[in-house]
C-alpha cells in the first residue's frame, strides 16, 4: 500500500489570529513497499506531513490518498479511522504514546480497539514485543518504569501489533546509544524486506544513505528536492545551504576531490567508497 499527497497545504489554527502556515502545495508519493525518508531542518514541515499520513491532521487544501481511501478537508471520521489502522505512526517521544498499567496491556490495547479479541490481541502483543527485543520479565511492568530505549521499543511494538501496512517513524533512534540505534534500524530493515512500507523522518543522513530508496527534502513547507539518495546527496552545496549536509563519507569524498582525487560521482556509503577505491 502506498500514499500520495496531491497539492497539499496545511495551516495550523487556520482562520484565527494565530494561524501558522506549515505546508504549501506539497506533492509527494510514497510507493508501496518503499523505504522513504523525509528530511528537513526544524520547521520544514516534516512533522506536519507525518500527521497527515495517518489522519491525525487533514489537509486544508489538496488530498492525501492512502491506498483507495482519499482524505480531504471534508473527510469523515470513518475514513480517517481506517487510515489510522493502515498507517502506524511512532512518535519521536515514546512517553507520549504509552499509557496503560503494564507493557503487555499497553501493546494489546491497539488491536483490541480495532475489534480483535483480548486473547488474540495479547498474542499479537507478545509477538511484537519479542520482535523489538523486550523480554517477558518486563511484560507486567509499568511502561513508565522502563528506560527511554525500552519505552521506545514498547511504543514501536504497540504500533506493530495493529499490523499496519505502512510504518511511519519520527526520529525513531533519537537519544539511543549506538548499539540500541543499530538494533532498531536492523528491525526496521527486516520489516521492510518482509514487504512493509517504511517512512522515516531523521536528521541522520547516513541512515538515509544506508536504508532509504527514496528521499524527499523539505524546506519551509515545500518539497525542494527529491529522488534516490545517491542523486540527492551529489548536491553537497545545496544540502549544506539548507543546513542538512550529506553522509559523512560523501563529505569526505568531496574533500578528497578538492585535493585532486577524481570521482565520477560521490559515494554515499562506506561500501560504495570501498568499491570506488578498489574498482
From Swiss-Prot:
Protein name: Energy-coupling factor transporter ATP-binding protein EcfA2
Record-stated family: Belongs to the ABC transporter superfamily. Energy-coupling factor EcfA family.
Function: ATP-binding (A) component of a common energy-coupling factor (ECF) ABC-transporter complex. Unlike classic ABC transporters this ECF transporter provides the energy necessary to transport a number of different substrates.
Residues noted as binding ATP in the record, renumbered to the chain: 40-47
Membrane association type: Peripheral membrane protein
Entry GO MF terms: ATP binding; ATP hydrolysis activity; ATPase-coupled transmembrane transporter activity
Keyword Calcium among UniProt keywords: no
Alphabetic keyword roster: ATP-binding, Cell membrane, Membrane, Nucleotide-binding, Translocase, Transport
Subunit relationships: Forms a stable energy-coupling factor (ECF) transporter complex composed of 2 membrane-embedded substrate-binding proteins (S component), 2 ATP-binding proteins (A component) and 2 transmembrane proteins (T component).
InterPro entries: AAA+_ATPase, ABC_transporter-like_ATP-bd, ABC_transporter-like_CS, ABC_transpr_CbiO/EcfA_su, ECF_ABC_transporter_ATP-bd, EcfA2, P-loop_NTPase
Lineage: Bacteria, Bacillati, Bacillota, Bacilli, Lactobacillales
Segments forming domain ABC transporter: 3-245
PANTHER family: ENERGY-COUPLING FACTOR TRANSPORTER ATP-BINDING PROTEIN ECFA2, HEAVY METAL TRANSPORTER
Keyword Acyltransferase: no
Amino acid at each position: 500500500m502506498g500514499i500520495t499527497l496531491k497539492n497539499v497545504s496545511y495551516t495550523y489554527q487556520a482562520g484565527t489570529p494565530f494561524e501558522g502556515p506549515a505546508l504549501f502545495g506539497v506533492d509527494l508519493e510514497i510507493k508501496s513497499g518503499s523505504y522513504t525518508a523525509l528530511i528537513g531542518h526544524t520547521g520544514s514541515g516534516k512533522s506536519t506531513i507525518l500527521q497527515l499520513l495517518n489522519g491525525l491532521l487533514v489537509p486544508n487544501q489538496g488530498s492525501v490518498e492512502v491506498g483507495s481511501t482519499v482524505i480531504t478537508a471534508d473527510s469523515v471520521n470513518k475514513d480517517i479511522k481506517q487510515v489510522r489502522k493502515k498507517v502506524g505512526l511512532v512518535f519521536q517521544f515514546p512517553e507520549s504514546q504509552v499509557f496503560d498499567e503494564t507493557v503487555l496491556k499497553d501493546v494489546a490495547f491497539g488491536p483490541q480497539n480495532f475489534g480483535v479479541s483480548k486473547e488474540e490481541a495479547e498474542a499479537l502483543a507478545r509477538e511484537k514485543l519479542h520482535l523489538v527485543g523486550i523480554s517477558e520479565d518486563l511484560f507486567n511492568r509499568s511502561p513508565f518504569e522502563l528506560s527511554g530505549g525500552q519505552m521506545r521499543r514498547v511504543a514501536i511494538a504497540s504500533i506493530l501489533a495493529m499490523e499496519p501496512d505502512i510504518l511511519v517513524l519520527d526520529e525513531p533512534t533519537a537519544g539511543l546509544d549506538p548499539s540500541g540505534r543499530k538494533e532498531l534500524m536492523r528491525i526496521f530493515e527486516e520489516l521492510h524486506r518482509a514487504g512493509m512500507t517504511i517512512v522515516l523522518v531523521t536528521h541522520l543522513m547516513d541512515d538515509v544513505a544506508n536504508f532509504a530508496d527514496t528521499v524527499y527534502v523539505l524546506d519551509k513547507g515545500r518539497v525542494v528536492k527529491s529522488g534516490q539518495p545517491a542523486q540527492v546527496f551529489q548536491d553537497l552545496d545545496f544540502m549544506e545551504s539548507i543546513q542538512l549536509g550529506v553522509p559523512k563519507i560523501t563529505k569526505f569524498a568531496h574533500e578528497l576531490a578538492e585535493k585532486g582525487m577524481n570521482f565520477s560521482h560521490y559515494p554515499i556509503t562506506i561500501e560504495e567508497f570501498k568499491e570506488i577505491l578498489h574498482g
